[in-house]
Structures are given as C-alpha cells and as structure tokens.
Amino acid sequence: MIILSNKPNIRGIKNVVEDIKYRNQLIGRDGRLFAGLIATRISGIAIGFLLAVLLVGVPAMMSILGVI
C-alpha cells in the first residue's frame, strides 16, 4: 500500500508560479515603457530639434552678425 502525505511538497510548483509572475511583470513593464516612448516621441523630437537650434544656431547667428 502506498502512503500519501497530507502535506505534499509543492516547492517546485511555487517556484514555477513565482517565475511566471516575474516574467509577466517584466513583459508588462516593457509594454508600458514602450507605450510611453511611443506617446512622447513627437514632443521629444521637437524639443531635441529646438535645443540643437539653440546650441548651434544662436552662436552661428552671433558670429555672422559680428557680435562675437
């Protein structure tokens, strides 16, 4: 006769469940990050362009006008 325990060892199942939860959180975090990047790409490009114009254009214009 086989004796069955009333307290089975489910450590392996718990480890798999924890691994699945962790991977699910990583996938969700990646999805939210990507959605945020897509939502702000136009404003980011515009801000970068304006910053480049300020850093390059203003000194160039001052040089052309003879201020520097």
From Swiss-Prot:
Its EC number is 7.2.1.4. Pfam families: MtrF. It catalyses: 5-methyl-5,6,7,8-tetrahydromethanopterin + coenzyme M + 2 Na(+)(in) = 5,6,7,8-tetrahydromethanopterin + methyl-coenzyme M + 2 Na(+)(out). The keyword Cell membrane applies. Pathway: One-carbon metabolism; methanogenesis from CO(2); methyl-coenzyme M from 5,10-methylene-5,6,7,8-tetrahydromethanopterin: step 2/2. Its main location: membrane. It is found in: Cell membrane. It is a single-pass membrane protein. Keywords: Cell membrane, Membrane, Methanogenesis, Methyltransferase, One-carbon metabolism, Transferase, Translocase, Transmembrane, Transmembrane helix. GO terms for biological process: methanogenesis, from carbon dioxide; methylation; one-carbon metabolic process. It is an enzyme of class 7 (translocase). The chain crosses the membrane at residues 45-65. One of its GO terms (molecular function) is tetrahydromethanopterin S-methyltransferase activity. Induction: Part of the probable mtrEDCBAFGH operon. GO terms for cellular component: methyltransferase complex; plasma membrane. Belongs to the MtrF family. The complex is composed of 8 subunits; MtrA, MtrB, MtrC, MtrD, MtrE, MtrF, MtrG and MtrH. Part of a complex that catalyzes the formation of methyl-coenzyme M and tetrahydromethanopterin from coenzyme M and methyl-tetrahydromethanopterin. This is an energy-conserving, sodium-ion translocating step. This is Tetrahydromethanopterin S-methyltransferase subunit F. It comes from Methanothermobacter marburgensis (strain ATCC BAA-927 / DSM 2133 / JCM 14651 / NBRC 100331 / OCM 82 / Marburg) (Methanobacterium thermoautotrophicum).
